[in-house]
Structure formats: structure tokens, C-alpha cells
Amino acid sequence: MGKNKTKKRTRRPNKGWLAGSSATQTICSSFLLVIAVGTLLLTLPISSRTGRLGVIDAMFTATSATCVTGLIVRDTWSQFSLFGQIIILMLIQVGGLGLVTLTSFFALAARRRMGFRDLRLLGESVSADGLSKATEVLKIVIKLAAAFEAVGIVLLLFAFVPQFGAEGVWVSVFTAISAFCNAGFDLFGRFGDYSSLVPYVNNYYVQAVIMFMIMAGGLGFMVWVELAEYRKKRRLSLHAKVVLQFSVIFWVGGAVLLALLEWSNPRTMGGLSVPGKIMAALFQSVSTRTAGMNTIDLAACSPISKLLMSVLQFIGAAPGSTGGGVKVTTFAVLILTIRSVAQGRDDCVIGGHHIESKTVYRALTIIVIGAVAAFGSAVVVYYNTAETVSVIDCIFESCSAFGTVGLSVGVTGQLNTGAKLLYMACMFMGRVGPVSLAISLTAKPDDNKRKVLPVGHINVG
């Protein structure tokens, strides 16, 4: 009598090139790897004009560049050599588009096979709705980024080449990529350390080009994909509509409030013409959402203006964009959930769509954790700098770090080693934390009763 033999099933290993770790771990470790390499390169004597840069300052700069923040402890133009500036720009580009996005693109270009885990990770990194669409979206993302940056470079050449000569080409390249990636780094320290775009407060052309680049990078690649396909499909997803509507609300609303608050302030907008005041208010509103460039002296702004900008920095840009923060859709879900509750509903409704409860819970969790991180770090920094810095300035700077914005009122330059490490953690969490949190909170769909309204899907965080 023969014995029944059963073959033991063995799980086939995932042969994808990103196999071996979860999506959250891969995203976090990839950013940490880039930061580590960037730190090593920036500590080389060839990277700085003086030939010496401390490890902590190099790590802070690498973290700020990779997390596309823009907070600096050493002025980019006056302290770093051309080699160092190139390293910083490379970190910005990798951090803005994402290491996962770039490596996925090169893997596809080399015709390498991507496993299921790889596709899922790629889909999360570009906020693609569905694995089958991930590779298609990836190609569009790279093309869009290259196109926007090329256009920005060409437009800025007309302003910077006449001003700086041949060096204007490099200034144009650096500024365009930094603006599109919402990084906030600049090469205008030649006009004074940490001057940012203050020397261009009356140059409407430069401001307009940079605003365009900031908006392009901050809307999110999936929104641009839908806008590119709008002529064929004649419709936008709920996600794209929410991103566009609330982005405009925050851009315009922020500009109006800043103009009202700073209109007569002689140290900020008071000395500008009426068109100059309007332009400065609009530029600062757009930049505050995660770009980190300024045309007015932020330290001279009123406390209420700083508080307003802190909120805008905390909100940030759109999911799948080059910007940070808790994301505009996350904040939109919170606001519209509050509205729904005020109307007596027990669910969140946006544009005639019922938003799944797990999306609402995810948004609330991201905002609460983000608030704890931002304001918790503000308390710690204030405790260490209370003699020279106000509490409002600490809140402003901490929201800038968490929102990966890069705007500064002078606090960062006064940080001790411990506070620098805290802000590095804040920048890292602001860049990869919300994304990682959204992934880790993703649950399997349950068997809830069908609602009367159609279900809407929005990427948050």
C-alpha cells in the first residue's frame, strides 16, 4: 500500500528589486541612505569654500536638502563651493522626486522585472491609484518633472544671465530645480547671508517664474496627469478637484490675509508700491505652502502674520508632490468632516461623495501626530533659546521644519547641537512620516453597508 506523499509548499521569494522590506521601511531607509551619503560628501574639503564643515552642519544640510526643506545653518552660496552646491542640488532632486521613483524609472529603463511589492511601493511613492497604473504614471512623472524644470531654467536664463553673466546659467539651473522641488535653497547669499529673494522683491518676472515652478511642484504629479488627460476624458477625479480647489483657496486666502496684516508695515511691505505689495503677498502665500523662499523680511512680520504662515506651512502641499506638510487633502478632509458634523451628519461628504471612514481616521491621525511633532519641538527649542527667541518664532520655525518649508525668522542659526538634531528629526518626519503613516494605517476593506452616495477615493498624507 503506497504512502500518500504531500509536497510541502514553499513560498516563492519575491524577486523584485526592492524585495525584503515593507514599503514603509523601504521609503524611510532610502531617505536615510541618501542623507548619509550626502553628509559624507558635504564633509569633504572640496565641498566648502573654507575646506572645513562640521559633521553636524553637514548632516543638517544634507537632511534639509533631501527632505526638500531649505532650513540652513550655513549659507549655500557663501559657504559651499561649486562641488558642494552640486551635491546639494542632487540631494534636492533625489529628495523631491523620491529615491523610489528614480530607481524605479531606471529599473524600467533597463527592462528589469518589477515584483508585486515593488509595484505597490512605487504606487505609494507617486500616489498612483492602482498598481497597474503605477509604471504608466512613473514615466509621466519623470517627463513632467524634466519638462517643468527645463521650462523654468530657460525662463530664468533671461533674468540671471544678463545679471550674472555665464554664472547665471548655473544660478538658473539651481533656482529652477530648487523651486520645482519646493526646496527653498538658493544662491543669492552674495547679496547678504540668508537673503533669499529679498533683492528681487521688485522683480515681478523672477517672482512669477518661481511661483509657477513652486505651484507646479506642489500640486502633485497625479493631478498633472489628470490635467494632461482632461481634453480626452473631460473630467477630473474627486482627488484632483479637492487639490485644485483647496490649493487656490489657500493661495488666494493666504495672500489676502498677509496683505491686510503687512500692508502698512514699513519693515516688510510698507515701502512697496501697490502692485509690489500684492505681488509680495501672493508670492509669500504660495511659497509658505512648502517652498521656503521669501521676498520680505520674515523676522520683521507681525506675530499674527507669523502665526498665519505657521498654519500654512503645517498644511503643506498635495500628496504625491515635491512638497511636504500634512498635505492639503488631509486638511480638507478635516475641515469638511467638521462641516458635516456641524450639519448633523455622521460621515464626511465631499462633492457629493461619501468619504470612507478609514480615510477620515487617517487624516485625523496624521494631523494630530504632526501637531504633536511640530509644537512639541517648538517647546523644546523655546526652552533652550528663550532668552533670545520668542515663542511665536519657535512655533514658526518648527512648523517650517515639519512642513519641509525652509522659511526662517532666524531661529535655526541659533540652534545648539541638540536642537539641530531635533529639527533634523522633524524634517525627516515631515517628509516621510505622513507617507509612511498613511501606508502603515492602510487596512483591508471591510464589508460595510453600501451607502446611497458613491464612494470617493482621495490620497491623503
Which positions does each model-derived feature cover?
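Membrane-proximal intracellular helices of multi-pass ion channels
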Residues: 1-461
